[in-house]
UniProtKB/Swiss-Prot annotation:
Descriptive protein name: DegV domain-containing protein lin2658
Keywords: Lipid-binding
Annotated Gene3D superfamilies: 3.30.1180.10, 3.40.50.10170
Record organism: Listeria innocua serovar 6a (strain ATCC BAA-680 / CLIP 11262)
Residues binding hexadecanoate: 63, 96
Domain DegV, first and last residues per copy: 5-282
């Protein structure tokens, strides 16, 4: 008899509600703390409200990971629902303890096989893993095959972000060293990416136009190497800017399927408003 597999992820995937419902993806929220008040991302605070509150806040917002107890509660519930296995997919362990908390909680549940999976990224890059795992679980694919597919996606996947300034990342402790200093220089648009699970500075580019062009050049190489079949443009509270770039990319690279996503509160805390990102992988 096939094992019954559930898929769990966290709120930083920013998956559309209909996708979560259709694919039965369980979501554990991270929280954002604004002026001493904690909000569960996606439940107590929408993305639009977050950016509005940040503008009015006295202090710089921070984020916090879900406690192991939240995972224990969910895993127990899934076990009661008859699941044998849980694949718990989370944002990079290099920027958050969420993955570790899921893994620790999983070890405490008797009679349930919890496989914690480190996406090594975040946002819709992480969401791609959750969607693939959930589609395969619903098709009754075995655990080994699902993990093997996730590993293939990980091998092909990449993500680059352009931010307006690096101060948020520096204050949030998510950027190595004194790299934030470059952001204060006139017109510098830093391009960031994930390297060894951390957010690091990839390149310093003079203008937004040049930064986006540089990311497009990297995508072009990935397409030639057969590593980019589906991509997401990710925006920081500027859907128009995101959609404009998505349409441009769609016409430039018709062989790739492009969709629009966003940086929600937790990731927005670190990247700031106006950030733009692009992530891609195989389907």
């Amino acid at each position: 008899m096939n094992e019954k597999i559930a898929v769990v992820t966290d709120s930083t995937t920013y998956l559309p509600d209909e996708v979560k419902e259709q694919l039965r993806i369980n979501v554990v929220p991270l929280s954002v703390i604004i002026d001493g008040k904690s909000y569960r991302e996606g439940e107590e605070l929408s993305t639009a409200d977050f950016y509005k509150k940040v503008k009015e806040a006295e202090n710089f917002p921070t984020s916090s990971q879900p406690a192991p107890g939240e995972f224990i509660q969910l895993f127990e519930k899934l076990k009661e629902q008859g699941f044998d296995t849980v694949i718990s997919i989370h944002l990079s362990s290099g920027i958050s303890g969420t993955f570790q908390n899921a893994a620790s909680a999983g070890e405490l549940i008797d009679g349930l096989n919890v496989v914690a999976y480190d996406s090594e990224l975040s946002c819709m890059a992480q969401g791609m893993f959750a969607v693939k795992a959930a589609e395969m679980a619903l098709a009754n694919e075995p655990l080994e095959r699902i993990i093997s597919e996730l590993d293939k996606i990980k091998k092909a996947q990449d993500a680059y972000f352009m931010v307006d300034d690096l101060n948020n990342l520096q204050r949030g402790g998510r950027l190595n060293g004194a790299q934030a200093l470059v952001g204060s220089l006139l017109q510098i648009k830093p391009i960031l990416h994930f390297n060894d699970k951390q957010i690091v500075l990839f390149e310093k580019v003079r203008t937004q136009k040049k930064a986006l062009k540089r990311i497009e050049d990297i995508l072009e190489v990935a397409i030639k190497n057969k590593n980019a079949e589906k991509a997401y443009v990710i925006h920081g509270n500027d859907p128009e800017k995101g959609e404009t770039w998505r349409k441009h990319l769609e016409s430039k690279f018709p062989e790739v399927e492009f969709e629009l996503s966003y940086f929600g509160p937790v990731i927005g805390t670190h990247l700031g408003e106006g950030a733009l990102g692009l992530t891609w992988s195989i389907k």
